[in-house]
Amino acid sequence: MLDIKWIRENPETLDKALAKRGAAPLSSELIALDEKRREHVGKVQAAQERRNAASKEIGKAMAAKDMGTAEKLKAEVGELKDFLAHAEEDERRLSKELSDALSTIPNIPLDDVPLGKDESDNVELRRIGNPHNFSFQPKEHFELGEALGYMDFERAAKLAGARFTVLKGPLARLERALGQFMLDLHTTEHGYTEVMPPLMVRDEAVYGTGQLPKFSEDLFRTTDGRWLIPTAEVPLTNLVAEEIVDMKGLPLRFTALTPCFRSEAGSAGRDTRGMLRQHQFLKVEMVSITDAESSVAEHERMTACAEEVLKRLGLPFRTVVLCTGDMGFGAQRTYDIEVWLPGQNTYREISSCSTCGDFQGRRMNARYRPEGEKSTRFVHTLNGSGVAVGRALIAVMENYQQEDGSIHIPEALQPYMGGLTRIEKAA
């Protein structure tokens, strides 16, 4: 959430930032709401002060046996109480109107984010690894998985409908191995603390990270009002909600391997075959909580941690910076890491690493107190996939496929596979 004080002082900056995102100007509307609220608050405060003063004057008039004045003051206090009973409710309503309006405004892109309308305007930063030249036509992961007998979309559809997968045998173990490998890397070498968070959260948590109120259609909700997490970013970031964290302990770095649940609203017709776009999938998430001065450097560090996963797996990838029109709602800047999929002959996103500034910290009311200062500041937050486990499985299958349809297991994963070096067709 943006600071209304900042918006009052920088209306043109806000509207220019919204224009970069392809959105209409909103500063005038927001400032008008704020002025209406501030004017009303002024009236309420004046009425409260007069009520308190008149109440004291009643006592003085009674002591002086000036009953006429006392009665007039009592009548005035009664009128003020009646006014305040309605006015304080109006104040809450006006404050909510402003808060609701602010909650739908996206974050302000950093100055170095490239301008653009959509993913075609994203800017490539680097490529690591060269795509393998196959001596045969490489297959897509779902062709390989079904031929091996370990990937079953038909039974998954029978159980749950479209966009689900059943993995069996060594492919199920390979997905588990990938998640464990990523967690071990991030916790033992990258300094992240592993967390096993709830998979269902309250409204406040999803609001804090920015999925609510604007993107509720992308989420699954239980009958008792909880939300299935679309990413572990939600519970990990909200660990510090409504808290003042010790600045000496910053940065806080959390990681988790969880199922994620998404309705994929608006994705009709996209990636309908295979595991690329699922309602349920595994992902390793990284979250950092920092002070204001450290978040830019932390963004580079987090992205490097995600890239290291793919380097260890020997998977070719590229890193791009998203343009203003392709960034997520809460991000100030986002790096996408795209892995090479030879079956599709293209790069596909496998990780997205974003710095959000104090946007989420303000929504969560998560703060820290700089050393030597009495006042607090909102924390800066960052999140990144480290990485999407299902997509990593896809990438391993396609990049390590053999002409006979078997899958070579990358060396980094073999210790997690009981020494198995190849996945072959089920007997």
UniProtKB/Swiss-Prot annotation:
Q: Where in the cell is it found?
A: Cytoplasm
Q: Which residues bind ATP?
A: R262, S263, E264, E349, I350, S351, S352
A GO CC annotation recorded here is:
cytoplasm
Principal place of residence:
cytoplasm
Q: What class of enzyme is it?
A: ligase
Q: Name one Pfam family in it.
A: Seryl_tRNA_N
Does the record carry Protein biosynthesis as a key word?
yes
Q: Its function?
A: Catalyzes the attachment of serine to tRNA(Ser). Is also able to aminoacylate tRNA(Sec) with serine, to form the misacylated tRNA L-seryl-tRNA(Sec), which will be further converted into selenocysteinyl-tRNA(Sec).
Q: Write out the similarity annotation.
A: Belongs to the class-II aminoacyl-tRNA synthetase family. Type-1 seryl-tRNA synthetase subfamily.
Identify this protein by name: Serine--tRNA ligase
Designated gene of the protein? serS
